[in-house]
């Protein structure tokens, strides 16, 4: 591409309440994950979205709340997780998480139909949940694309994937941001400019 994609301003407009912040931790130990969740919630009144074992024996923890609350909870979580101990696989703190993310974070949802669209699609597969959420958030804040599907860890060996649709130039801009944010955590990124009719709107049968 000729230039870096323009990044949308994710900061809420003046006078409007903050969008919820999001904190995510992936741990290699289920027992450590539970103690991390306990410490995080005792430190600040964040709302616990998820604290559960997932595929490959990992523990996944998600919290939301005001920015200051999530910051404090994440500080406590890191202290108990033990930086450098090997228990903390990945972490993510998003002060202003994009609004399209939230409905995909608690449990798998049925993706919206897009059979009638002529949109292009990218499929992103990552090694960690944090990488998927972080890169999807960045892509959504960079280009006018739509998050169609997101699956996190359960039933897919602890990996994560998501799909984005939009005009070809927009999904290509989103893909550039995804690659940058994921780095070595990106397992695969595929772009289909014009999905075949049998797959359009339902990539997974």
From Swiss-Prot:
Q: What is its main location?
A: other
Q: Which GO terms describe its cellular component?
A: bacterial microcompartment
| Record keywords | Bacterial microcompartment
Which parts of the sequence belong to the BMC domain? 21-106, 120-204
Q: Where is this site: Gating residue?
A: 52
Outcome of gene disruption: Required for efficient BMC formation; when deleted from an artificial operon (Hoch_5815, Hoch_5812, Hoch_3341, Hoch_5816, Hoch_4425, Hoch_4426, Hoch_5814) being expressed in E.coli, a >10-fold decrease in BMC shells is seen.
Concerning biotechnological or industrial application, the UniProt entry reports: Artificial BMCs can be made in E.coli by expressing (Hoch_5815, Hoch_5812, Hoch_3341, Hoch_5816, Hoch_4425, Hoch_4426, Hoch_5814) or (BMC-H (Hoch_5815), BMC-P (Hoch_5814), and 3 BMC-T (Hoch_5812, Hoch_5816, Hoch_3341)). Cargo proteins can be targeted to this BMC. BMC-H can be modified to place its N- and C-terminii in the interior of the shell (called CPH). Fusing proteins to the C-terminus of CPH allows targeting of cargo proteins to the lumen of the organelle composed of CPH, BMC-P and BMC-T1.
Q: Which SUPFAM superfamilies match?
A: CcmK-like
Q: Where, subcellularly, is it found?
A: Bacterial microcompartment
Q: Which InterPro entries match?
A: BMC_dom, BMC_shell, CcmK-like_sf, CcmK/CsoS1_BMC, Micro_shell_prot_PduT
Q: Which residues form a coiled coil?
A: none
Where in this protein does the record put region Disordered? 1-20
One short Pfam family name for this protein?
BMC
Record-stated family: Belongs to the bacterial microcompartments protein family.
**What does the entry note on its domains?**
These proteins have 2 BMC domains which evolve independently of each other, giving the term pseudohexamer to the trimerized subunit. Although the homotrimer fills the approximate space of a BMC hexamer protein, the BMC-T trimers are more compact. Their universal presence in BMCs indicates their structural importance. The homohexamers form pores of at least 5 Angstroms in diameter.
Self-association state and partner proteins as the record states: Homotrimerizes to form a pseudohexamer. Unlike its paralogs BMC-T2 and BMC-T3, the pseudohexamers do not stack. The concave side faces outward, with the N- and C-terminii exposed to the cytoplasm.
**Function per UniProt:** A minor component of the bacterial microcompartment (BMC) shell. Expression of 5 proteins in E.coli (BMC-H (Hoch_5815), BMC-P (Hoch_5814), and 3 BMC-T (Hoch_5812, Hoch_5816, Hoch_3341)) forms 40 nm artificial BMCs with a molecular mass of 6.5 MDa. This protein does not form stacked pseudohexamers in the BMC. There are 20 BMC-T pseudohexamers per BMC, composed of mixed BMC-T1, BMC-T2 and BMC-T3. The shell facets are 20-30 Angstroms thick, with 1 of BMC-T trimers protruding to the exterior.
Q: What PANTHER family does this protein map onto?
A: BACTERIAL MICROCOMPARTMENT SHELL PROTEIN PDUJ, PROPANEDIOL UTILIZATION PROTEIN PDUA
| Protein name from the UniProt record | Bacterial microcompartment protein trimer-1
Question: What is the organism lineage in this UniProt record?
Answer: Bacteria, Pseudomonadati, Myxococcota, Polyangia, Haliangiales
């Amino acid at each position: 591409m000729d230039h870096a994609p323009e990044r949308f301003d994710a900061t809420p407009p003046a006078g409007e309440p903050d969008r919820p912040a999001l904190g995510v931790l992936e741990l290699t130990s289920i027992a450590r994950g539970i103690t991390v969740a306990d410490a995080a919630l005792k430190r600040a009144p964040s709302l616990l979205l998820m604290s559960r074992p997932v595929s490959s024996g990992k523990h996944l923890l998600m919290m939301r709340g005001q920015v200051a609350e999530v910051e404090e909870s994440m500080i406590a979580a890191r202290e108990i997780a033990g930086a450098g101990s090997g228990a903390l696989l990945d972490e993510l703190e998003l002060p202003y998480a994009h609004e399209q993310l939230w409905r995909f974070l608690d449990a798998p949802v049925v993706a919206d139909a897009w059979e009638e669209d002529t949109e292009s699609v990218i499929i992103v597969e990552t090694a960690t949940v944090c990488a998927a959420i972080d890169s999807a958030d960045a892509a959504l804040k960079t280009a006018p694309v739509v998050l169609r599907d997101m699956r996190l860890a359960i039933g897919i060996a602890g990996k994560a994937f998501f799909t984005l649709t939009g005009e070809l130039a927009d999904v290509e801009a989103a893909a550039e941001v995804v690659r940058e944010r994921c780095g070595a955590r990106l397992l695969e990124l595929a772009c289909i400019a014009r999905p075949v009719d049998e797959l359009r709107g339902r990539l997974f049968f």
